[in-house]
Each structure stands twice: as C-alpha cells, then as structure tokens.
C-alpha cells in the first residue's frame, strides 16, 4: 500500500483548467521576499541567550543531563555486578556498550517525562503572554495560513480548510488573514479537481480575494520547496505565516492567540503547538490518539520545559515569522547522492536550527489547545510514513555539524537520528543476551535441566539481573503511569476519557497491543535503517487519511516473510528448550501474529466497538470543539458527492 490516491471507477467529468473564471484571481499581487540558501560550512550563533528564555534554563538542562547520567550510572553499576565476577568477555562487552546507550536513551526520556508531569500537574509552563483563559486579543498585522497539498483528495482537504476559515471568521478578525492552498500535485486529474473544488469553496464562503490557490509546475524540494516558493513570491505581504498539514484543523481562537504571541514578542521566530490526534476510527488509530492524548502532554510539556527558547519545529500547526524564515531557513541541497544527498527531507528540524542560529527564539506552547491533526489509520500506513522519516532523520548526519548551530539544535537532530538506531540496537541487545549463556554454558539437550537464559542470568547475578529488568521496564513505562496519574488529578479530562477504570483498561490494552506490534516495528525500522545506509531512497507518496482498508493479499505481502521468520525462530527455540522459547516469547509471538494483529487493529468496527464500550475515549469525542464538528460535517457531505478523482 503506497498511500496514493487512485482514480475511482465512478468519476465525474472534469472541465479543462481553462474553464476556471479568468476574471477571478487565484493569487494576490506578488510581494517578493529574498530567501537565500544557507551555508552549512560557515556561520555563527547570533544570540546565545534569548530574552524569552525561561528563568533557570541552565538548571533545567543540568537536571536533564545530570539525571540521565546519574540514573544510567546506577543501572550500569548493577549491570557490572552481573558481568564482572568472571571477567567480561567480548560478547559481554558488546552487551554492556549497548546497555549503556539504550538505558541512557530511556533514562533521558524518563527525566524529561518527570519534568513534564510536574509542569502539567502544577499548571505551569505558560509563556509569551499567551493565555487561553484571557479575552481574545485584537490583532494588528496580516497572517497567511498555508495548506500545502500533494495528490490529496481535494474535497476532503478543502473541507478542513473551510472549517478553519469559518472558525477564524467567528473571532471577528478575518480581515487579518489570507488562506493559501499550495498544491504540489503531480496527477493532472487531481489538479483539475483541486481547481474546481477551490472555486466551489470560494463561492460558498464568499472567499474570493481571501482564499488563494497555487499549483507548482515543478515540485522541487517537496514540501520545503513548496513553502519556500510561496515565501519568495508572496512572503513580503505577511509578517507571519501559519503552516498547516493536509489533515490539520485549528480553532480561530488558537490561531488569533498565536498571531498575538508573535506580535507581542518581536524576537520570537516560531511558536509550535501540540496537535492533538483526533478522528481515529480504526482500532490502531484510536489507540494512537488515546496514547497521544494521555501520555503526549507529559512528553510535550517535558521537552518544552528544557527546550526553552530552542524548541523544535514539527513542520505543521506552527506559526512562523516570515522575514526570519526567509533570512535564515533557505535550505541548501546536500552534497552527494540520495538518500543522504540532495534536498533536505526532514526539513523542519533543519529550518528551526538555522532560524535559531540566526538569532530567533523558537518556542513550544503545549498548553494551548485547539490544534488538531489525524493519525495514520493502520500500522502499515504508519510504517510507510516512518520509512520516509527514517531517511530524513538519518540525513541530518550531514547537517548536525553545521557551523554556528545552538547545541540544543544539534541535540534535536541527534535524538532524531538515535530514534531509528535504537531499533537495531534493541534487537542486538536481545540476541547477545541469548548468545552469552549459549557461549557460556552451551546447549545440553540430554541434560537434567533444559537450557534457559533466565536461569543463567538469575543464577550468575544473585538476582541483580531481575532488578535490571524491573528498573528498565519501569523507566520505559513511566510516561504512561505519569500520564494516568495526571489524568486522575484532572476530573474533567478523566471523565472525558471514560473514568478511572476505563482509562486504566485503555492504558493496559494500549500497552499490550503496542508490545505485540513492537517486534514488527523494530524489524521494519531496522530494515529501514539498513536500506538507507545501503542507498535506497524512500520516494514521496501521498498519505492515507481515511480508514485503512488492507486486503489479505496486501497483508501477506507486507508481513508474510516476517511471520514465517517468527514461526521459524519459535520452532528452533523450542527445539533447543521450551524455556528459551518462553524467554523469546514476546518477540516470537509479535512476529508470528503480525498479520492477524495488523488486520485486527486496522478494522473500523473493532475501534468503534471499543469506543461504544468507553475504551480509548478522548475529550474531543465527549465534547468536540465546534471546528472539529464542522470539519466532520463537511467531510461527510463531501463523501456523498460524486467522486472527482
């Protein structure tokens, strides 16, 4: 499944492009803005300490790094007590090295999550004068809302834009905003459909002269090039631009407050919101959006707490100062061939780093609600997107050493790179954990006691190996636990998530399903890393937005090999020892059952049945904001229209 939109057998005849009313302008007068390509080999950090940086930011970062180091040091000391008595072999040295890196990885996430939990419970972390509980500010400047699109269903796309447009109009400040649909569509029939639906939208909301449409003839540099083209042609008319994704929905209230935050803080270059994932209907989408709603704030508030004025950019649902972006975020083409060379794929991290190098503050405001997106409907769709992100993040290895970057910006990129390398590292850790007892004790099929890695590790460490396992699992699962505690302390949110019992059941079920899918994700992420290192490009396809519809042949093509491999591993492990098969059970079961698990979680009826039972519920379903209700109404109505594609 490549996620692209395919022609329908019942399509409506489309008029030629020239049939658009020539008297109705689709673009405003151009206001060019220079956007030079940045030099990664030259440059210096313009401002080291930002005015809007929170007090004690150095202490916060010391806590994060010091806490990570201290927690990891304790775990390594215990691990050494397991390995040291008989000396450390080559395999044990490899195990120790992997353990240090992986435990430090999860320890940093744990330390950040603890900070996020305290911030959420204390209702702290508000900054830039953006307070959603205060009256709506009056704006003074113009802002462009940009919605890039690439081979998307135009009716669905513009239904979301219409909901945003109407929500902004309800604030009484529509005159401060223009809306742009920036098309990079390559399929001609979809391009013609975009123009027709755009015209219908403008007629419907009287948006001519305020809603604009532009389709590039050459979609060079993908989304980054799409936005850069707009900046170079029209950016001079708009002090701010708010970047949307094709599935983004934002309330007018939130948009106005973001613009006011930029107007009142002239040294801020970017403000990133925390988009809540909504509208999930398949089991997979619903478990993802529940996890994002319950654990997501803990994680987001944590990183915002120590990011300070060096926050990251996620590519959408964020407002950017146009002049700052033009001056500092022109992306160069990286030297070499794909996948590491060429256009920057994960452009958002790099744009944020370059803007911070240029002296602009970058902030995240996770407390500001009213920002929404949709998640992939199936694990397959997630992994297709993840493969593209893998290539983009690994490509940052060519950018992380650029001159003049703030060290936190470099850290963002290293974390992004590390996210994908942890998958093969976890796999190696498990294999070495089995290999050490095999090398140490061998396999005696005729012995009184069958081979058991668990017995080996327990017997050789006086129980310390068990403590390492318990501590590792606690650190891994702590964000879920902290998210649940924070939910219990917020009666309104708790009620909207189904109450304490149903929320606990949801967390437990999400954890079990995530554990079943973890071996699949680990394998495919590891394969993605090796493919990128081998030079295989990910390409660029449109994303699937609606319910996933995975056929059994497609499932067997995607996961058949992994299923056979899991069954083979299970048979070999059982032949050696049932205890070994039990030790490897979580990985074997996840691989062997990958087809039915992906099929089950891809079903809409399963997800909706759990919703009726109060499982995986989120506040936006109990009391949906008006903009989401309107977007859903418009999309349902659009689905009833004759297909244009």
Swiss-Prot record:
The chain crosses the membrane at residues 64-84, 98-118, 423-443, 465-485, 504-524, 559-579, 580-600. GO terms for biological process: glucan biosynthetic process. Residues 1-13 have a biased composition (Polar residues). Residues 1-32 are annotated as: Disordered. It is a multi-pass membrane protein. It holds the Pfam family Glyco_trans_2_3. GO terms for cellular component: plasma membrane. InterPro entries: Glucans_biosynth_gluTrFase_H, Glyco_trans_2-like, Glycosyltr_2/OpgH_subfam, Nucleotide-diphossugar_trans. The keyword ATP-binding does not apply. Its main location: membrane. It is found in: Cell inner membrane. Keywords: Cell inner membrane, Cell membrane, Glycosyltransferase, Membrane, Transferase, Transmembrane, Transmembrane helix. Its EC number is 2.4.1.-. HAMAP family: MdoH_OpgH (MF_01072). Belongs to the glycosyltransferase 2 family. OpgH subfamily. This is Glucans biosynthesis glucosyltransferase H. The gene is opgH.
């Amino acid at each position: 499944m490549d996620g692209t939109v395919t022609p329908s057998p019942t399509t409506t005849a489309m008029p030629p492009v020239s049939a658009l009313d020539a008297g109705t302008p689709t673009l405003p007068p151009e206001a060019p803005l220079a956007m030079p390509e940045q030099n990664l080999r030259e440059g210096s950090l313009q401002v080291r300490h930002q005015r809007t940086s929170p007090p004690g930011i150095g202490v916060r970062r010391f806590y994060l790094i010091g806490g990570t180091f201290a927690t990891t040091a304790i775990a390594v000391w215990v691990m050494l007590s397991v390995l040291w008595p008989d000396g450390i072999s080559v395999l044990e040295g490899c195990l120790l090295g992997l353990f240090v890196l992986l435990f430090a990885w999860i320890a940093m996430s744990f330390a950040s999550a603890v900070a996020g939990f305290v911030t959420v419970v204390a209702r702290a972390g508000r900054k830039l004068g953006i307070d959603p509980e205060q009256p709506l500010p009056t704006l003074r400047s113009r802002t462009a809302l940009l919605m890039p699109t690439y081979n998307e269903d135009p009716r669905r796309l513009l239904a979301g834009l219409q909901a945003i447009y109407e929500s902004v109009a309800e604030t009484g400040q529509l005159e401060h905003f223009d809306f742009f649909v920036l098309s990079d569509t390559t399929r001609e029939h979809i391009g013609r459909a975009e123009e027709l639906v755009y015209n219908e939208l403008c007629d419907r909301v009287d948006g001519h002269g305020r809603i604009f449409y532009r389709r590039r003839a050459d979609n060079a540099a993908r989304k980054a090039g799409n936005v850069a083209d707009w900046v170079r042609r029209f950016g001079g008319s708009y002090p701010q631009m708010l970047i949307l994704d094709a599935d983004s929905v934002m309330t007018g209230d939130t948009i106005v407050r973001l613009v006011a935050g930029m107007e009142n803080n002239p040294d801020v270059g970017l403000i990133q919101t925390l988009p809540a994932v909504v509208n999930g209907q398949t089991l997979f989408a619903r478990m993802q959006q529940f996890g994002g709603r319950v654990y997501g704030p803990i994680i987001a508030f944590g990183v915002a707490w120590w990011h300070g004025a060096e926050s990251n950019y996620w590519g959408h649902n964020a407002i950017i100062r146009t002049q700052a972006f033009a001056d500092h975020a022109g992306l160069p083409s990286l030297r070499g061939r794909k996948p590491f060379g060429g256009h920057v794929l994960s452009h958002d991290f790099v744009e944020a780093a370059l803007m911070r190098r240029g002296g602009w503050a970058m902030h995240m405001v996770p407390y500001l609600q009213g920002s929404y997106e949709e998640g992939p409907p199936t694990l397959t769709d997630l992994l297709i997107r993840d493969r593209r992100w893998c290539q983009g993040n690994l490509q940052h290895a060519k950018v992380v050493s650029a001159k003049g970057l703030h060290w936190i910006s470099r850290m963002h990129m290293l974390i992004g790179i590390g996210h994908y390398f942890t998958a093969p590292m976890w796999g190696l850790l498990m294999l070495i954990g089995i290999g050490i007892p095999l090398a140490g004790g061998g396999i005696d099929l005729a012995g009184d006691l069958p081979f058991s890695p668990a017995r080996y590790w327990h017997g050789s460490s006086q129980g310390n190996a068990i403590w390492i396992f318990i501590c590792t699992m606690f650190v891994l699962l702590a964000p879920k636990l902290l998210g649940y505690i924070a939910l219990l302390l917020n009666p309104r949110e708790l009620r909207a998530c189904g109450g304490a019992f149903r929320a606990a059941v949801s967390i437990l079920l999400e954890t079990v399903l995530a554990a079943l899918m973890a071996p699949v994700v680990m394998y495919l992420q590891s394969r993605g890393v090796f493919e990128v290192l081998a030079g295989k490009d990910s390409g660029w396809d449109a994303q699937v937005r609606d319910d996933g519809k995975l056929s059994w042949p497609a499932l067997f093509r995607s996961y058949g090999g992994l299923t056979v491999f899991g069954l083979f591993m299970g048979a070999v492990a059982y032949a050696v020892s049932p205890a070994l098969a039990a030790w490897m059970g979580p990985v074997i079961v996840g691989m062997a059952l990958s087809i039915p698990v992906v099929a089950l979680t891809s079903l809409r009826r399963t997800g909706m049945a759990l919703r009726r039972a109060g499982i995986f519920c989120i506040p936006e379903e109990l009391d949906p904001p008006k903009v989401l209700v309107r977007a859903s109404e418009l999309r349902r109505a659009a689905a009833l229209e004759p297909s244009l594609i």
